[in-house]
Amino acid sequence: MKNKLPPFIEIYRALIATPSISATEEALDQSNAGLITLLADWFKDLGFNVEVQPVPGTRNKFNMLASTGQGAGGLLLAGHTDTVPFDDGRWTRDPFTLTEHDGKLYGLGTADMKGFFAFILDTLRDVDVTKLKKPLYILATADEETSMAGARYFSETTSLRPDCAIIGEPTSLQPVRAHKGHISNTIRVMGQSGHSSDPARGVNAIELMHDAIGHILQLRDTLKERYHYEAFTVPYPTLNLGHIHGGDAANRICACCELHMDIRPLPGMTLNDLNGLLNEALAPVSERWPGRLTVEELHPPIPGYECPPDHQLVEVVEKLLGTHTEVVNYCTEAPFIQTLCPTLVLGPGSINQAHQPDEYLETRFIKPTRELITQVIHHFCWH
């Protein structure tokens, strides 16, 4: 029953008060079961059918799909339920208590992105879902902030094929139709230790890594020269050497050296092609030192994403908002949802607040976000 649904600010408050941190470090990682239960109960109260999906390979994480309406097509509104960990020493407020001050709603997940579900629920209390001519789906996913396991698994297992989808990440209500992907790898070189007084009796892993880095930097130049997408502020794939460690003493030949690096591919670049380019770049080192160099994934890769600029979803949203779509450098779940249907990233709050101490969402987004959700439901589910 709709009258059981709490007021907007109380929905928001309950979502923020329910911890759902995702982290690679097990001690910090939390289940999102409590948040999924909250959302499932509220959508059931609104008359939706609700399915809760365990996500394999996670620490008790779940997706939730709420659906209403019959037939094919329709609209999918999607978002993730998890937040990043917080630095207690840098927050001046309780991260799990929603507080309002000076036109801002503070709390962990207010912008990124629990708030989007509060907006959806509050908007739907004024929508007669029994009159929808096409289905409306609400997807809440797990582990976006780490592996994107929830969106990956959902996209691999669902038969759902909506007409289009909107992911409510904080974009300041500016529609995003493309972003780069992310590949992160560990390059590991195994040498042979020995006393530094006799270098010929060992194989110095740092020296081999120095050689490997030279080839990787040549690959960086190749990517910059070969691939371009002028809509991006950085219009080429970037390659970054982010972390290196090797050796344990000045008087020992280094036995192991490890490098962490990432590549941000443009939309349209396949992950297989990029991995092939990396292996090709490192081939001279591998051939000279067989069995001593390995490449492993640090995290599951995320492909680049693009919604066709001439798709109806882009045209409708640009008309509703009176603005043009943008492209961004950060990653979202859009590449996985895009395998189901054309997808835009569009939601309240600023990306500049994501992962920040004293995270907040400005209250000026409340009215236009409600209006936008109402308008897209009307357009894609009532016509």
Swiss-Prot record:
This is Acetylornithine deacetylase. Pfam families: M20_dimer, Peptidase_M20. It comes from Escherichia fergusonii (strain ATCC 35469 / DSM 13698 / CCUG 18766 / IAM 14443 / JCM 21226 / LMG 7866 / NBRC 102419 / NCTC 12128 / CDC 0568-73). Its main location: cytoplasm. It catalyses: N(2)-acetyl-L-ornithine + H2O = L-ornithine + acetate. Binds 2 Zn(2+) or Co(2+) ions per subunit. Its EC number is 3.5.1.16. It is found in: Cytoplasm. Belongs to the peptidase M20A family. ArgE subfamily. Pathway: Amino-acid biosynthesis; L-arginine biosynthesis; L-ornithine from N(2)-acetyl-L-ornithine (linear): step 1/1. Zn(2+) 2 binds at D112, E145, H355. InterPro entries: AcOrn-deacetyl, ArgE/DapE_CS, Bact_exopeptidase_dim_dom, Peptidase_M20, Peptidase_M20_dimer, Peptidase_M20A. GO terms for molecular function: acetylornithine deacetylase activity; zinc ion binding. Its cofactor is Zn(2+); Co(2+); glutathione. The active site is at D82, E144. Gene3D superfamilies: 3.30.70.360, Zn peptidases (3.40.630.10). Catalyzes the hydrolysis of the amide bond of N(2)-acetylated L-amino acids. Cleaves the acetyl group from N-acetyl-L-ornithine to form L-ornithine, an intermediate in L-arginine biosynthesis pathway, and a branchpoint in the synthesis of polyamines. Keywords: Amino-acid biosynthesis, Arginine biosynthesis, Cobalt, Cytoplasm, Hydrolase, Metal-binding, Zinc. GO terms for cellular component: cytoplasm. It comes from the Bacteria. Homodimer. Zn(2+) 1 binds at H80, D112, E169. One of its GO terms (biological process) is L-arginine biosynthetic process.
